[in-house]
């Protein structure tokens, strides 16, 4: 009996060890629209301390609505997140946009856990003629991780224009096809402020979006989610993965991170940080 109990104890201990090992090998991926992130916000220490806490929650995070032509605000953010120890590196797009209003896509990542393999900006047509598809074309990045089931995974970020959300979300299907042809991979995550809900995408409009109608795409942040800090209830921010990528996703780990509640902030301060909550998922 004692031998049996000892064996069972060993089995349970081994199971716990493997579970903890599995969790320690997971990556937390996030996407956060930090409203108008530029020098004004970067000069506010109160807001930057909150943003730093949010960013350091993640191993890889996409930051959107980066209004930073000379990357001075980005460098300020890097100084904050690396203050205690130099853990994070970044890769950033060029300023993107068909008009004088431009934004960057910014990825921060823990260099001890992941590295950038390659990147490119999707070519959606000539902006001068107004024939381009996206207001802010995706800046596609492939990351490599030694500790996850999917070693190399590709992130396709998108911050849609609200009034063009249906068209731009549908066009993401073409971006996926381009990534597959260019890099011979189908381990793909689409993420960002899709404006995919409430009045911007509703009813029959969903049937016009191929990454929704094609069931080889999995919407991990559902229509029931609320990604807005204000009183509205809208699932604007999303994470969508391909079937192949699902093998690297921790089941039921995708969620909205409510930093207002978690950091015990009043709503006006939370709104000063952003009008969006981050969305996240664990990769293992």
Swiss-Prot record:
Disulfide pairings: 198-234
Question: What is an annotated GO biological process for this record, any one?
Answer: regulation of neutrophil mediated cytotoxicity
Give one Pfam family. Exo_endo_phos
Task: Please classify the protein's predominant subcellular localization into one broad category.
Answer: secreted
Subcellular compartments: Secreted; Zymogen granule; Nucleus envelope
Q: Which reaction does it catalyse?
A: Endonucleolytic cleavage to 5'-phosphodinucleotide and 5'-phosphooligonucleotide end-products
Q: Where is this site: Nitration by tetranitromethane destroys a Ca(2+) binding site and inactivates enzyme?
A: 90
Q: Which UniProt keywords apply?
A: Calcium, Cytoplasmic vesicle, Disulfide bond, Endonuclease, Glycoprotein, Hydrolase, Nuclease, Nucleus, Secreted, Signal
* Comment on bound cofactor: Divalent metal cations. Prefers Ca(2+) or Mg(2+) which have a synergistic effect on activation.
**CDD domains named among the record's database cross-references:** DNase1 (cd10282)
* Cofactor(s) needed by this chain: Ca(2+); Mg(2+)
Q: Where is this site: Involved in actin-binding?
A: 92
Q: List GO terms (cellular component aspect).
A: extracellular region; nuclear envelope; zymogen granule
Span of the signal peptide? 1-26
Q: Name one GO molecular function term.
A: DNA binding
pH-related activity info reads: Optimum pH is 8.5.
Q: What is its EC number?
A: 3.1.21.1
Q: Which family does it belong to?
A: Belongs to the DNase I family.
Q: Any idea what job this protein has?
A: Serum endocuclease secreted into body fluids by a wide variety of exocrine and endocrine organs. Expressed by non-hematopoietic tissues and preferentially cleaves protein-free DNA. Among other functions, seems to be involved in cell death by apoptosis. Binds specifically to G-actin and blocks actin polymerization. Preferentially attacks double-stranded DNA and produces oligonucleotides with 5'-phospho and 3'-hydroxy termini.
Assembly state and interactors? Monomer.
PANTHER family with a match to the protein in the record:
DEOXYRIBONUCLEASE, DEOXYRIBONUCLEASE-1-LIKE 2
Q: What is this protein called?
A: Deoxyribonuclease-1
Organism expressing this protein natively: Oreochromis mossambicus (Mozambique tilapia)
């Amino acid at each position: 009996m004692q031998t049996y109990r000892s064996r069972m104890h060993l089995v349970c201990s081994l199971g716990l060890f493997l579970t903890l090992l599995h969790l320690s090998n997971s990556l937390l991926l996030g996407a956060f629209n930090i409203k108008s992130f530029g020098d004004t916000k970067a000069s506010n220490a109160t807001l930057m301390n909150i943003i730093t806490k949010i960013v350091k929650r993640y191993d890889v995070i996409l930051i959107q609505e980066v209004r930073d032509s000379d990357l001075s605000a980005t460098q300020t953010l890097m100084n904050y997140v690396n203050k205690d120890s130099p853990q994070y590196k970044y890769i950033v797009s060029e300023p993107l946009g068909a008009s004088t209003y431009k934004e960057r896509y910014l990825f921060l990542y823990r260099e001890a856990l992941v590295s950038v393999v390659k990147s490119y900006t999707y070519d959606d047509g000539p902006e001068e003629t107004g024939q381009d598809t996206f207001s802010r074309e995706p800046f596609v990045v492939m990351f490599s991780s030694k500790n996850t089931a999917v070693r190399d995974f590709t992130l396709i970020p998108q911050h849609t224009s609200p009034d063009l959300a249906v068209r731009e979300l549908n066009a993401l299907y073409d971006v996926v096809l381009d990534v597959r042809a260019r890099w011979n991979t189908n381990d793909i995550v689409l993420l960002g402020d899709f404006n995919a809900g409430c009045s911007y995408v509703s009813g029959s409009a969903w049937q016009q979006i191929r990454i929704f109608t094609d069931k080889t795409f999995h919407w991990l942040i559902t229509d029931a989610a609320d990604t807005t800090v204000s009183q509205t209830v809208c699932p604007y921010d999303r994470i969508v993965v391909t079937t192949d990528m699902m093998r690297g996703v921790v089941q039921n780990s995708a969620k909205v991170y409510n930093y207002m509640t978690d950091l015990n902030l009043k709503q006006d301060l939370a709104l000063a940080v952003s009008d969006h909550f981050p969305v996240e998922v664990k990769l293992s």
